[in-house]
Each structure stands twice: as structure tokens, then as C-alpha cells.
Amino acid sequence: MVLDGVRKALSRFLSGKGDYERAVKEFIRDLQKELIKADVNVKLVLELTKKIRERALKEEPPPGITRREWFVNIVYEELSKFFGGDKKPDIKPKKKPWVMLLVGLQGSGKTTTAAKLAYYYKLEGYRVGLVAADTYRPAAYDQLKQLGEQIGVPVYGEPDNKDAVEIARRGVEYFVSRGFDIVIVDTAGRHHREEDLLREMREIAENIKPDEVVLVIDAAIGQQAHDLAKKFHEATPIGSIIVTKLDGTAKGGGALSAVAVTGATIKFIGTGEKIDELEVFRPPRFVARILGIGDLEGLIEKVRRIKVEFTEKDVEEFLSGRLNMRLVYKQLVSLRKMGPLRKILQMIPGLSLKIPLEIEAGKAEEKIKKWLAIINSMTYEELDKPEIIDRRRIRRIAYGAGVKPEDVRELLKQYEMMKKLSKQLRKRRDLLEKLQLGFKP
């Protein structure tokens, strides 16, 4: 995840018991190191940490909150402002049909992002069409066509036509005439200079009259995103930005902060290669995950959109420590549909600080299938009270599930770990409620 070191530094700060001012100084040094490593502009880093230091040493915490706890709130607020503030991007189309023109430099992940965007809006209930107007890159049409088939979204393209403007115009007309709600136009990303990119953007825009122009930026370019975002923001009043590949680069923080300082709107961020790994960018929620505070609202939203049997009540039960194997089974089935376990667990307040190493390494998904089989071999009594499972029961369960007794013991160990973690989260939830973080929309 972007800026993983910040979360670890904050964890050390909270667990420390020495001099407060010295601890603040050490955390700020760690924060500066992590931000600069993420290619954030040094001047911006120094301005940010100066504000945090001044507030940390001057402000008195409200009654009932320690200075270290209040410091978490200060860091949260200042980082949220740093990445764009608490304004929510307007992602709903203002009318139908709504035409979106995607532009971006070569290698920014634009075609994949077009499909992710189409999938996102399809899950929101819109009829979406994709237009393949990238006539420069070989197999661009085939790639978008394949992605469209994967997500059940139609794709318009003319593989033998090299006129991108004409294809874009015809594609928009095709979907609009058939009553589609949203039309997403993918274009070529062959330009390495901002001026060339913006010139072609204007040419296509003049012909298809888009309602929104979306600039796709690769997070790997770091603070270089500033100039591109600034010129784009000045060139079109209807523009928004998607920052991609945040999971695959250490420079994601630099790219996000560089765009935010221009005043341009970041609507979405790409957090992985899978088609559903595109999320609305809301700085407070993003920062909450960086700090290990979690993003319960984001988790519930993901559950709602994917329509899994994993409710807000289930999340609350886990966080309250009321756990049994029935709930574990339900969670495992749901989590399989929601993507990598590590990313889901990072959304649970406080849990990202204590994610088991095997989940960090991405190996847990391989074991879920085996764990489900083990749970299916348990009796009703064992499901409700896993604590009664002894050596004899372990052998019986393993035989019924077709696994080794060690596999059953491993699941029971994970269950105990989850119970322990959920109890530890109670204290952190109390802190979050005091600070009014993490659980407010």
C-alpha cells in the first residue's frame, strides 16, 4: 500500500511511553522520510510537517483524550488536507446520456481504466458502452473488446479505420441512438509531451462534445504529475483525473499530492490489476487507511456494490468480539468475492497494523478453499463454540474435510488470532469514537 511506513511509524508513536515532544520529533522525521521516498515535493513535505509540529506542541487535547491520541487526529486532519481535503468528488452523471473522453500518456493504463470505469458504473445500474478509438497501439481494440466481454459491456470499434476522431464520433452516435446512459471513449496514449496530448484531446472533444474529459495518470511518474495535471486543469473546465497503479509504485503519494496542489479533481484511484480495483478517491478515507485507522465506510460500500452476504451487522459483530465459526465461514465466502484479503483487512479500523504475515504475502487466498471445507465438516455445536474442539474432534473434522489435522489446527489458530484482534480493536474503536474518525461518512 502507498506510504506503508507512515502506518508503522504511527504505531510506534502510539505504543511509546517516553517524552512526548521527542516522540513527535521522531514521528515527523519518519513521516518526512516516507513522503520524500514516495517522491513528494520536498518543499510540500516541509510545509506539511511544520504544520503538524506546530499543532502538536501548541494544541491541548479535549478532556478524556491523551496528547498522543490527539496527535493522531492532528496527523489525520493535516494529511487529509494535503491530499485534497474532505470534498467528495461528484461521480454521478448529471444527465443521460453522459459522454466521457479518456486521455492519457502512453503506458498510463488507460484502456484497462476505461473498462474498470465501465464496470464501476455498470454495478451502479447504468447502461454503459465503450468506444475503442485508440488507432495507434496494435491490438488496442482487441484488448478493450476482451475486457468488455469479461464485464458484459458492449464495445464499439472499427479495427480497419485509422481515423480516431471519426471512430469516436460514430461510436458515441451508436450508443446514444440506442439509449445508453454512459459512453466511455478510449483514445491513444502515444504522446510523451503534454502539448501534443492536449492538442489531440481538444480535436476529439470538438467532434464528440464530451460531458467530461478524464485524464489518466500513472502513479509511477510521482511529482511529475504536477505539470501534466496543471496544464490539463487549465485546458478544460470539465476535467477530472484518475490516478492508476497505486499498488505497484512507491511514488503514489508523490503523484496524488502533486495533482492535489493544482486544484484538479481526482475522482478515482486504481488500486490493483483486477477489474473491480477502482475506487472513488476521498482523501480522509485514503489517509485513514494509511494511518491504520481503517475505512469502514469504504468496506460497507464495497460490500453493497458487489452484493455479497456480508452486512454492516457482520462487520460490527466482528469488531465487537462476538465471533464463531458461522460468522467466519460467512466472512470467508464474502471475502473471496471482494478481492485480496490484505486490502479488505486494511479497511477495518486498526487491523491493518496487525495483519498476519501470510496475508501480507498474499498467500491466504489459497487457503480459504481448504478452510471452508474444514468448517463444513464441523457440527452445529462446534460451529457455535469452536473452543470445544479437542484432539479427537480435530481428527474427525480433518477426515471429513479431506485435509490433514495440522490444517484444522491452523484454522483454529487463525480463529483465536481473529478473536484476539477483535478484542484489541475495542480500545481503538473507543479512541476513534472520541476523535470522531473512521466511522463518520
Curated annotation (Swiss-Prot):
Keywords: Cytoplasm, GTP-binding, Hydrolase, Nucleotide-binding, Ribonucleoprotein, RNA-binding, Signal recognition particle. It is found in: Cytoplasm. SUPFAM superfamilies: Domain of the SRP/SRP receptor G-proteins, P-loop containing nucleoside triphosphate hydrolases, Signal peptide-binding domain. GTP binds at residues 104-111, 186-190, 244-247. It catalyses: GTP + H2O = GDP + phosphate + H(+). It is an enzyme of class 3 (hydrolase). It comes from the Archaea. Its EC number is 3.6.5.4. The keyword NAD does not apply. InterPro entries: AAA+_ATPase, P-loop_NTPase, Signal_recog_part_SRP54_M_sf, Signal_recog_particl_SRP54_hlx, Signal_recog_particle_SRP54_M, SRP/SRP_N, SRP54, SRP54_GTPase_dom. One of its GO terms (cellular component) is signal recognition particle. One of its GO terms (molecular function) is 7S RNA binding. GO terms for biological process: SRP-dependent cotranslational protein targeting to membrane. Part of the signal recognition particle protein translocation system, which is composed of SRP and FtsY. Archaeal SRP consists of a 7S RNA molecule of 300 nucleotides and two protein subunits: SRP54 and SRP19. Composed of three domains: the N-terminal N domain, which is responsible for interactions with the ribosome, the central G domain, which binds GTP, and the C-terminal M domain, which binds the RNA and the signal sequence of the RNC. Involved in targeting and insertion of nascent membrane proteins into the cytoplasmic membrane. Binds to the hydrophobic signal sequence of the ribosome-nascent chain (RNC) as it emerges from the ribosomes. The SRP-RNC complex is then targeted to the cytoplasmic membrane where it interacts with the SRP receptor FtsY. Belongs to the GTP-binding SRP family. SRP54 subfamily. This is Signal recognition particle 54 kDa protein. It comes from Staphylothermus marinus (strain ATCC 43588 / DSM 3639 / JCM 9404 / F1).
